[in-house]
């Protein structure tokens, strides 16, 4: 006889298949031709791949990250791929003054914004909580407060253009997982703030969409290095994740789960939270 956990998992999987069957992908790459995009965390990983996709679709892009030399290389490649315009601005989002400066730069150079894509993250160890409160404060500034500041600064121009805010988050902002205490806290904060803001924008009839992107483990160098030997989950391709994020933002989805099976997993957790099942995906060999 199937156990209750197995029944719920089977039901969640069946629902996901049913939704996939009836959902029709209406994405047209042409709709991003000439779109004005501010993309953060654009120097590596998912952000770099998003930059190349947007360039291929003919967007106008402002790239930002900390490393200027790398941004220059990404900009050059974007131009060869077909971007109509590309600018870059180095910025360290641990500084509270940077978000306003970055948005002003983007608006001045592009004449406005259609998409604000928030993707940057601060480096955080993948380990048990060690009591580093100062690191958590710093991480909240980079991973959360700077997102709030960027979105706040960009809302006026996004509203004029019926634009979109695309927030790259993580399953750790929906389901608390081990080894990610500080990181998970920042992602839960993103979910709470932007989900609440979405309600308020709708109630005020302000035509700005917010797409929250919930990602699993992605095969970026940084993620693979940190999780090696600690997580029993296959990593998904960064280029595919980047494209899924762009499509979700263009479709003005409320939430996007990538890979797709994270959605039934999250639904299962909401219905039947089971810490032991969750912990079975992690390897803890410490004291």
UniProtKB/Swiss-Prot annotation:
Q: Which reaction does it catalyse?
A: cortisone + NADPH + H(+) = cortisol + NADP(+)
Which Gene3D superfamilies does the record match to this protein?
NAD(P)-binding Rossmann-like Domain
The entry's active site is 183
Subcellular locations according to the entry: Secreted
- Which Gene Ontology CC terms are recorded? extracellular region; intracellular membrane-bounded organelle
Primary location recorded for the protein, binned into one broad class: secreted
Can you tell which superkingdom this protein's organism belongs to?
A: Eukaryota
Extract the Pfam families matched here: adh_short (PF00106)
Q: Quick one: which residues bind substrate?
A: 170
Q: Which residues bind NADP(+)?
A: 41-67, 92-93, 119-121, 183-187, 216-222
InterPro entries xref list: 11-beta-HSD, NAD(P)-bd_dom_sf, Sc_DH/Rdtase_CS, SDR_fam
Q: GO: which molecular function terms?
A: oxidoreductase activity
Q: Does the keyword Cell membrane apply?
A: no
First and last residue of the signal peptide: 1-20
Keyword NADP included in the entry's annotation: yes
Q: Which UniProt keywords apply?
A: NADP, Oxidoreductase, Secreted, Signal
**Its EC number(s):** 1.1.1.-
- UniProt function note: Unidirectional NADP(+)-dependent cortisol dehydrogenase (in vitro).
PANTHER family associated with the record: HYDROXYSTEROID (11-BETA) DEHYDROGENASE 1-LIKE B-RELATED, HYDROXYSTEROID 11-BETA-DEHYDROGENASE 1-LIKE PROTEIN
Q: Which family does it belong to?
A: Belongs to the short-chain dehydrogenases/reductases (SDR) family.
This chain belongs to the protein called Hydroxysteroid 11-beta-dehydrogenase 1-like protein
- Organism, by scientific name, is Gallus gallus
